[in-house]
Amino acid sequence: MTKDEAVKIFNRQRVRTHWDEEAEKQHSLIVEVVSPDSSPFTCLKKEMYITDDYEADLRNLSKQKKAVVLAVEVGGRYVGRVTLRHDWGDETSIIEKDFPGLPQINALEIDENYRRQGLATMLVTVAENEARRQGFSMIGLGVEISNEPAKRLYEKLGYSYQQVGGSDTYDFLFGKPNPQVYKLRLMTKSLQTEANHG
């Protein structure tokens, strides 16, 4: 099975994908939706960086059908994750003002031992297809201005930079009780430019 075929059959249930691309020959991958109320999420939280605050956020959004957590499992352990969210949170409501209804790809993370093997591209593609399936015609994400590898990945995947509130960057506050300020760029991509993968 090719990566594209695996992405096409994704249907919000556990999907086993066994493709044989050069960089992934040794891995049998599982891409799955992980509910924040499930025991697999407990494992995902331990294996990937998920704070208690973010978990609470995801639980709330999931109950409202406004978030889908996708994870990649290799050899029985989680090595990557991403969230498709229908909101931008309180700290970045300026985005919702300029781009109402824009869903976001959020919290993309790949274990450092599994990077540069196509897993990030696969997770972004699956998240885009899920957004398409949900009826969205555009998707966005925030990328830290100093994160050159992520910016290159998103540019390669067809994302383009947008201004928010008349500025090239926006502030994102992360962490409690003493939040740290990150400078981000908004990137968006039309989901109508590619054939529907459903």
Regions from the PLM with identified roles:
Residues 59-73, 136-151:
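Generic detector of contiguous secondary-structure segments
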Residues 81, 162-164:
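Residue-level detector of high-confidence beta-strand sites
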Residues 85, 142, 165:
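Conserved residues at the C-terminal ends of beta-strands
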Residues 2, 9-18, 137, 144-151, ...:
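C-terminal "cap" of GNAT-fold acetyltransferases
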Residues 107, 111-125, 134, 145-152, ...:
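Conserved glycine-rich acetyl-CoA-binding loop
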Residues 65, 77, 117, 134, ...:
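Structured loop/turn residues at beta-strand edges in well-structured enzyme cores
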Residues 18-112, 124-126, 130, 191-194:
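Acetyl-CoA-dependent GNAT
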